[in-house]
């Protein structure tokens, strides 16, 4: 049983396929690297896998066999979030951004420039997933941190501050 998995609907497989320009695994590795720097312990390797039971554009984050988060993205589209209270209404598919619960709109590449000029924050589908993954890991890291991880942290701290560890 893999500790952490990202399950992808078949419509999202291109996001993970380098031959099709997908860099999802590389981005997830970046999240893990950042997490080590910020939190001080290593997130276990993440396995990407397809899951034909999911809707085509659905993804799930699974930790030790338990679902911890789910979402849906639209590859080839851009998620526009009205973070500056713009009065501009964008044509597209209305949705809710999965991390912060903001109202958002999936827009085409043609609408992207208009959205940016109107003050919207615009991100691609893989960025939405990776941000969701990073925030989910931060929220659930207390479950991921093992006794062995704590021992490694203490051993490293002992080199720098032995008196603190002895207390």
Residue ranges and their predicted role:
Residues 1-167:
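Membrane-embedded alpha-helical signal segments
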